[in-house]
Amino acid sequence: DINSNQKLSVATTVNQVLLRSEVTVSQNGEIATLPERNRELEKVNWVHQDKIGYIFPDSATVNLSNQIQKGRWSDITDEKNISDEIVSEKVFMLWFNHGERPQNASYQYIVVPNVTAVELNETSDSNRDIEILANTTELQSVKHLKHELCQIAFYKAGEVEIAKDTNMRMDSQGMAMISMRGNKIEKLSVSDPSRKLSRITITVSGIYHSEGDDFFTIPNEHQNDTFIPSH
């Protein structure tokens, strides 16, 4: 969640690059090529610029600028001998404006590289087979439906449903990647980016029997889940 008590506008930048093509937008189901200017857009389904697509799964209100920007390199650096000449370029900017003093604000989007606007429009309804399972302060999780691959970032202990009647719990912060077949887990990878934990303990729905150099499983037939300590 995005929170601030400051009387300053809070923004999340999606991208800011040189403008290299026309900007096409799907807004409330209507597709249009935008003229050069700055604007706020509501009910945006997707945006396309320079072979890159940006999908907004729930539709979103975003700010978009595709116009000339001017500035000096000397204004953004403390280095000496930097030219104070005014530079002018056409720039593409896409961002979320959360406003002043946002409370529990959030955002989500999908970036699709090397795609045409036509291809993006044809596949955006399915979000390119990507499902956002969770997007909270506790954890974030996405699943590629076609490849049956889940990725989860736990910021603290939490639980997420990764398939119908299949949940995964972690007792601490950590990250997990899960390859699935249907509702069954085929491969589970776990990491501790903080490198501070002595162990990570996971509980998954279903009964599994496996053992490795740094993990083992404890099936619980009564609860129909499996306890997986790792170190």
Residue ranges and their predicted role:
Residues 1-231:
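Terminal accessory/anchoring regions of large secretory-pathway or extracellular enzymes
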